[in-house]
Regions:
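ASCE RecA-like P-loop NTPase motor cores
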Residues: 1-590, 597
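Acidic, low-complexity intrinsically disordered tails
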Residues: 1-5, 440, 576-658, 663-673
Length: 673
């Protein structure tokens, strides 16, 4: 059984050895909850990686957003290159959930776009967990508490191959279809297979390569890994497991049984609506569910099939759904990163989902069973989380209570860097004062973060700085995950010097080039100016040797005073350690590529964000398009889709948008044919 093998160019220093020893001992002794209170830049991720190596248990790293999950995924990939480090986040590039607003009688239909690459990574994560390996780390967002397929059904459809084993080729093909692989001899894509005589090529749903199985009569003659483009052999196997192409596995028998139960519940709910005087809702529900059942009978699926998931998996009403945590063995560890944010987020997921579904059920859009397609309740998550390490620079009361006083502090940074100096300055003329500070930093090729209280103020401040020739960008809630990563990379690369934001400059952002953090209206008590928020924001300057934070305020609030006192306490401890060990603070130097998953050569991107003509001529501009047959149009649409996906992978969103628009226009033309 493979063990975790940590690879790093450095060894634990400062507080790290003690923190690693305490956390390891706690996990091995079965302590249910511990807290790692680590300051920004103290190497919390490296500490956790050492703990994982010591305990050798499958581990779930839970982060509160995709950007930080991607950052952690890249770091753990580099620490454990020889082990299974997987990534599990929502696979939607865009998701508009189904909803009904009674006040305006507005029904909003579900709309989504699935990211094929992330779908592959999700399948790779579940496949690694069910392989029986112990050396598995899964980095996840809160998607891990959302409903998914039954792990037992997924495992039952695993196909085990062995060279020399007797297996009829046609039986093998039927098993592939049962595992939701599709035969396509012309265009082999992920999740498909093709047959050429005695050779079967399978494009595994969780891999970038093909698996080639060669038969000699009814015997497996060879099992090989093949490059999908060059068809060169990459390796051979004596044994191999093929995991299903989809996380949501069902059988014909379970589908037939589910349809019968759904129709029974439909008649009960329709009768209920008629009894309470809601004939319109009864009619709507009957028509919608009847149509869905016809679609499932004919095609095997329907829009919104997840709302019937309870029937397919034989769950009782009100029981919790299966989720990623069910794929882990019983003896596993959960590490909750930035726990002061992640824990409340886990707690809030169920309530938000239930409020939306309640209207859909009450007004006849969905059966009551739709309520069981949901994220875990917080109590259900607690029951599954048998051993947890909470990681935060500012742990909340919940984590401290759960840990029952077991708090491991990590204050010393391996680089010798100190917590930033905090200055409080009056808010009068704060913008002019800040501009002087910014100019000083720009001369030293350093970066600046500015946090405001409102989105409007962030926009106006950005415009003001730009008018004064200060290269500025601002980040807000409308910026999607990939673009946010690109903005961070651009800041680090020096394409602009100042980043302005509201509540998006706090937890986990790894920006060593930032030497100044300016907090405007620091004395306005509230969520954005609480003790924890201020401490996290100040911490963004802690990775730079010249780190400094300026709070613009007319009075010192309790939250400000707590932040200043705690920062000074840590700074004093760090100074003392540096003096005792003869350490001179060193600037952190990190590669500018944020993750293995979301990476691009930033130099390849144009400075402008304008919508430009692509190098290739847009297909819909060609007059010959109007005379194409349906088949020709479909091929052109598929080509545009692939080009769009390739551009998105390179983070070239402008070109991707062009191909998307081209594809949508051609789809409109196809409808008219």
């Amino acid at each position: 059984m493979p063990k975790f093998e940590l690879t790093a160019d450095y060894s634990p220093t400062g507080d790290q050895p003690e923190a690693i020893a305490q956390l390891t001992e706690g996990v091995l002794q079965g302590v249910p909850a511990q807290t790692l209170l680590g300051v920004t830049g103290s190497g919390k991720t490296f500490t956790i990686a050492n703990v994982i190596q010591n305990i050798n248990k499958p581990t779930l790293i839970l982060s509160h957003n995709k950007t930080l999950a991607a950052q952690l995924y890249g770091e753990f990939k580099s620490f454990f290159p020889h082990n299974a480090v997987e990534y599990y986040v929502s696979y939607y590039d865009y998701y508009q959930p189904e909803a009904y607003i009674p006040s305006t009688d507005t029904y909003i239909e579900k709309d989504l776009a699935i990211n094929d690459e992330i779908d592959k990574l999700r399948l790779a994560a579940t496949s690694a967990l069910l392989s029986g390996r112990k050396d598995v780390v899964v980095v996840s967002s809160v998607s891990c508490i959302y409903g998914m397929g039954n792990p037992a059904a997924f495992y039952d459809n695993v196909i085990e191959l062995k060279r020399g084993k007797l297996l009829d080729r046609n039986v093998f093909l039927r098993r592939l279809v049962d595992s939701l692989y599709t035969r396509n001899d012309l265009n082999l894509e992920r999740g498909c297979f093709r047959v050429k005589g005695d050779t079967v090529d399978i494009y595994l749903a969780y891999s970038d390569n093909l698996l080639r199985v060669t038969f000699w009569d009814d015997e497996i003659d060879a099992i090989e890994e093949v490059d999908p483009v060059s068809c060169l052999r990459l390796g051979s196997f004596d044994e191999y497991r093929i995991y299903p192409a989809n996380l949501f596995m069902t059988t014909k028998e379970s589908t037939a049984k589910a349809i019968h139960q759904i129709e029974d519940d439909l008649h009960k709910q329709v009768s209920y609506f008629e009894e309470i005087g809601k004939p319109y809702e009864a009619k709507r529900l009957y028509e919608r569910v009847t149509y869905d059942m016809e679609m499932i009978r004919e095609l095997g699926h329907c829009s919104g099939i997840e709302n019937y998931s309870r029937y397919f998996y034989g769950r009782e009403a009100g029981t919790r759904p299966y989720c990623l945590l069910d794929f882990f063995p019983e003896d596993f560890l959960i590490v909750i990163d930035e726990s002061h944010v992640s824990v409340p987020q886990i707690n809030a997921m169920y309530g938000g989902d239930r409020a939306r579904k309640k209207n859909l059920v009450e007004y006849g859009f969905r059966l009551p069973a739709a309520m069981d397609n949901r994220p875990l309740k917080f109590e259900e998550f607690q029951q599954l989380a048998r051993q947890v390490i909470y990681v935060s620079a500012t742990p909340a009361d919940y984590e401290l209570q759960q840990s029952e006083g077991i708090v491991v502090e990590q204050v010393i940074r391996p680089t010798g860097l100190l917590d930033p100096i905090i200055e409080v300055r009056p808010s009068l003329n704060q913008v002019d004062d800040l501009m002087e500070e910014i100019q000083q930093r720009i001369e030293k090729d350093e970066r600046i973060l500015v946090t405001t209280l409102t989105k409007r103020m962030a926009e106006e401040l950005t415009d003001y700085f730009m008018k004064h020739d200060i290269r500025t960008n601002y980040i807000h809630s409308d910026v999607d995950t990939l673009e946010r990563v690109q903005i961070m990379d651009d800041l680090r690369a020096g394409r602009f010097d100042v980043l302005v934001g509201v509540n998006l400059l706090r937890e986990g952002l790894d920006l060593p080039e930032v030497s100044l953090v300016a907090i405007l209206d620091a004395d306005k008590e509230g969520f954005l100016r609480s003790h924890r928020s201020l401490t996290q924001t100040v911490g963004r300057a802690a990775r730079n040797v010249h780190g400094k934070a300026i709070m613009y305020a007319d009075r010192i609030t309790d939250s400000m005073q707590k932040t200043i006192d705690e920062t000074n306490r840590r700074r004093e401890k760090q100074l003392k350690y540096n003096e005792e060990h003869g350490i001179t603070p060193q600037q952190i130097k990190k590669g500018r590529k944020m993750t293995d998953l979301i990476s691009a050569n930033a130099e390849a991107h144009a400075e402008t964000r304008a919508y430009i003509e692509p190098e290739e001529r847009m297909a819909v501009a060609d007059p010959i398009m109007e005379y194409m047959t349906r088949d020709q149009l479909e091929k052109s649409i598929e080509r545009s889709r692939k080009l769009m996906q390739e551009a998105a992978k390179k983070l070239d969103f402008i070109e991707a948008a062009q191909y998307r628009d081209e594809m949508l226009r051609m789809e409109e033309m196809l409808k008219e044919k």
